[in-house]
Structure formats: structure tokens, C-alpha cells
Amino acid sequence: MTIHTDTRPTLNLIRLAHGRGLDLPAYETKGAAGMDLRAAIEDGTTLTLAPGKRALVPSGFIFEIPEGFEAQIRPRSGLAFKNGITCLNSPGTVDSDYRGEVKVLLINHGDEPFEITRGMRIAQVVIAPVTQVRVAEITEVSDTARGAGGFGSTGV
């Protein structure tokens, strides 16, 4: 008999009052990297995002991210492709020691106003490991084939 133990880290969360009735963040497919976040705006209202404008949209949840991890807030590709709606500061980092509500900073790069309603999937969150490094000041760096070649230096 094989016993399977789930060794994945746990994302603890608190549902806020305005998040009641919303689905928990969830992976929509077996191979999904990100869990969908939903808009926790007041039921029966619409948040209209005009072209070129931005809005901070509440998720209705406080995350307790495991130590050694971060939550990356990323755009949903369908919203970006179909409507020009994306996340600013993407990916947005939510540190493991942050204890406030997770909110999504959206911008409308499209040509038409975009209506956000309660429960709409507005972004995705990826939980990723973080490595903190030691910092050392040195006087020169080692040589590489690339050298100091920057933007576009390896071809188009």
C-alpha cells in the first residue's frame, strides 16, 4: 500500500467580510502555475476602468505566505489580450511578512472602458520560493563572454 503525503507548503488565509461568498484562490487546471484571484467589490456594483486609468481592486483575503516564499501577482492573459487589462508592477510581490489585504493594481491599456464586477477573475497569484543573498562589495567582476553587453546585445 502506498501512502501519499501532501508536502506542498500551505497558504493560510483570512477571508475578510467583503470577501464572503467568493471562491477561494484556486488553480483552474491541474498544471496551472497560478491561482485565480477574484474582485471583492460590493455586490451589485460595477467598477468601470476607463482607458488609461488604473484601480486598486481588493481580493477579500489576507494571505499568510509561508516563510521563504513570496506571492507574485500577475495578469491574466485573456484579460490582457482581449481587453488590454493588465497588472502594473508585474509581477507584484507580496512578501511573506505582509499581513494586509491582497489587492490587485489593474490598468486599462485598451481603447474601451472595462467593467469589473464582483467575483470576476482579475489576476493570478503564483507562490514562489525566495532566496535572500549575502551582499558583498567588490572592486571588479569576473569576465564573461557577454561582458557588459546590455539591452539587445545578444541579438533581436
Curated annotation (Swiss-Prot):
It is an enzyme of class 3 (hydrolase). Keywords: Hydrolase, Magnesium, Metal-binding, Nucleotide metabolism. It catalyses: dUTP + H2O = dUMP + diphosphate + H(+). Pfam families: dUTPase (PF00692). One of its GO terms (molecular function) is dUTP diphosphatase activity. Pathway: Pyrimidine metabolism; dUMP biosynthesis; dUMP from dCTP (dUTP route): step 2/2. Its cofactor is Mg(2+). This enzyme is involved in nucleotide metabolism: it produces dUMP, the immediate precursor of thymidine nucleotides and it decreases the intracellular concentration of dUTP so that uracil cannot be incorporated into DNA. Belongs to the dUTPase family. This is Deoxyuridine 5'-triphosphate nucleotidohydrolase. The gene is dut.
